[in-house]
Amino acid sequence: MFAVAPRPAPLAPAQAGPSTSPQQTLKKSSSQSSITSAPTKRRRTVTPEDSPQDSAPSQPQKKAREGPKKKKANRACFHCQKAHLTCDDSRPCQRCIKRGIANNCREGHRKKAKYLLDDDELEALKRSKEGAKGKAPEPQPQPQLHQPVVATMPISEPVPQSEQLLTTAFDPTTFAFGSEAANLEYSILSAILGNPSPPDSASSPPPPPSQSHYSWPSDPLDFTASPRLGTSFTSSYTDAQQLSISSDSVLSTSPSAQFLNYSYSQQQRSDEGSDLPYSQYSAQAPLHPLQPRYPLDQRPRSPPTSTVGEKVSTDVASRGLLTPPLSNASPSSIASVPPGVAEIPQPKSAVSHLQSINDRVTKPYDYTEGYHFLMKHLPTRFEKNDILRVVRALAIFRPSLIALQMPLSLDDEIFVEKCFQRSLLELGKLISYSGTPTVVWRRTGEICLVAPEFCMLTEWPMEELVGRRKYIYELFENQSVVEYWENFASHAFENTTRSVYSHCVLLKPDGTPVPATFCFSIRRDLFDLPSMVIGQWLPLL
């Protein structure tokens, strides 16, 4: 009988490709087995036993503190607290001992918060604050200014630099305006612009030996009205707050102010208060800066007087000025004239004109008659289209005119008419200096003032233009009338332009056209109503 050997294990299927030798297969298998059999390397952990004791440490170890830890002090001393340094509880502390200031080592003061204070401490804090407020600092002596002194005036003591401007030049009682605020403003301006030299000391009484005297007229005209202007204006040089100038020793400071401010007559001024002592003036209580110098119902009503001469009055009357011109006479010669000699009243031409305006204007001006005449005049000259253009222009500014006139009372309208008449006086004087053909009319077109040059240009007589009720659009050609009303409607309540320039054709009495360039400006009254129109023409040659 035969024994059967076991079947060998099946080989892996051969890969496609070239056949390999048995030696190569053995090498590959041996290399793979060696890779799988080798264990993976692990990082060795160093234990305290394995580490060498004598090796240097990688990092330096912290040095152990010698002695007990320093305890923080509950409260630092004053010097350590001020220097923001660490202190200890011992007194004197070690730091002060090292610095050699052990004798001054004291407890520092720590400020408590308000919510931590006790009631007693709160009361003490309030009392200390009230006491600090109650103690007012003593007033320091003010720096003193100085103005050069006239050589003819004796000086008994030197005056510091800033004294005179504070006590005399800036004295609000020097000038006789309605309020001391205006007096102070004018006195400062007078000091800045420079003051004229005072009059000769021979015309004034000798001053006391203990006081210096100064005269401060801001205008030469002051000497003509004040016989006491050359007398003493005393001021104390020990107290800049004391006012020593007589309250009624100066008249108005400018020529134009004579008609605006009340003033004493010479007889009144020479009789009252001329010999009052210095103490009586300095003892008067100072007024409030806005308080008037005199009550309105007690102000003297005498008109200003002039002692210059008859020539001044005739000059003013011939020119129709509201204010008299400055005199050529020197202040000293005028001040030496005694009161009552050559005393001639002011010209009454300007005053009479103003008084006549106040007496004549008793009711407001009726503007409705001017518009009624315009509505009657348009159909007689214009076609329908031109009439519509004029009416449309009137409709533009009519609502604004009514809205501004509604709140006005009867007194307001009378006041507006008085202002209008006064403006005509000023414009009449201005037109007399100009050679340009000029006409002034109301907003309705009624002519109020005509320059002679306009009469020469248009050959219209002055009596017919001003004496009768003549309207400016009656002198215009038709197209110029329409353009005028359209321009007036556009600029009656406009603030961007003050004057309107255009062309205009004027008509002579016989109907001959006069082409010219035309410029007119609209003036408004106190209530912003267009009340006056000023027109000027230049002929086109």
From Swiss-Prot:
Enumerate composition-biased segments (Basic and acidic residues). 126-136
Q: Which GO terms describe its biological process?
A: cellular response to starvation; gluconeogenesis
- Alphabetical list of InterPro entries matching this protein: ERT1_acuK_gluconeogen_tf, PAS, PAS-like_dom_sf, PAS_13, Zn2-C6_fun-type_DNA-bd_sf, Zn2Cys6_DnaBD
Gene3D superfamilies according to UniProt: Zn(2)-C6 fungal-type DNA-binding domain
| A GO CC term attached to the entry | nucleus
Residue ranges of the region described as Disordered: 1-75, 126-146, 196-221, 286-315
Q: Which SUPFAM superfamilies match?
A: PYP-like sensor domain (PAS domain) (SSF55785), Zn2/Cys6 DNA-binding domain (SSF57701)
Segments of skewed composition (Low complexity): 1-39
Compositionally skewed regions (Polar residues) per UniProt: 48-61
Q: Which UniProt keywords apply?
A: Activator, DNA-binding, Gluconeogenesis, Metal-binding, Nucleus, Transcription, Transcription regulation, Zinc
* Domain PAS: start-end pairs: 423-495
The name of this protein is: Transcription activator of gluconeogenesis ERT1
Taxonomic source organism: Coprinopsis cinerea (strain Okayama-7 / 130 / ATCC MYA-4618 / FGSC 9003)
Gene symbol? ERT1
